Design a protein with these regions (language model features):
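A conserved regulatory-domain signal marking ACT and ACT-like small-molecule sensing domains
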Residues: 1-169
Length: 169
């Protein structure tokens, strides 16, 4: 698992992926996104070389681009992942602790969160917090929907759930 973070600039994805390609790496699941003024990459890759050789090849590129990286050997293989069966959207007035409260309630209702994205919109005097979650409803949709209804009522947010059917092919 390769994790990189640094100030956003053009060419990060191209240069990092080029290093991995040159090492005969096969990329699997990846998340690459800009957060604030930073860019972050988390990706799985199968690379035939030893971990220290990968670090040696990545370091000059990371130094040049101002990136920090962390590399871990993991057991999971490429293309061995769980697909989400539900998408949840929560939005309302920005309030401290909403992510902790929402994810606690959803976890207790059996949701295994696979992806969570959030943003703050609106205006400085009335910010709106928006959260989108994809996951697996381990205890079923009804249990999850009940938890969302309680959350919406208690925290005065809009909480919506949509079952999804994802196909990877």
């Amino acid at each position: 698992m390769l994790t990189l973070v640094g100030k956003d600039r053009p060419g990060i994805v191209a240069e990092v992926s080029r290093v991995l390609f040159d090492m005969k790496g096969n990329l699997g699941e990846a998340s690459m996104t800009r957060l604030g003024g930073n860019f972050t990459i988390m990706l799985m890759a199968s690379i035939p070389e030893k971990i220290n050789a990968v670090e040696e090849k990545l370091q000059p590129v990371c130094d040049k681009l101002g990136l920090f990286f962390h590399l871990d050997e993991i057991e999971a293989g490429l293309h061995q992942h769980v697909e989400p069966d539900v998408r949840i959207s929560i939005h309302g007035a920005d309030q401290a602790g909403i992510v902790a409260l929402a994810t606690d309630a959803l976890g207790a209702a059996g949701l295994n969160i696979l992806n969570l994205e959030s943003d703050v919109g609106g205006y400085p005097e009335s910010p709106v917090y928006v959260m989108h979650i994809e996951g697996v409803a381990g205890k079923g949709f009804d249990t999850l929907n009940k938890a969302l209804q309680v959350l919406a009522r208690e925290k005065e947010v809009v909480a919506e759930m949509t079952p999804i059917d994802t196909m990877v092919g």
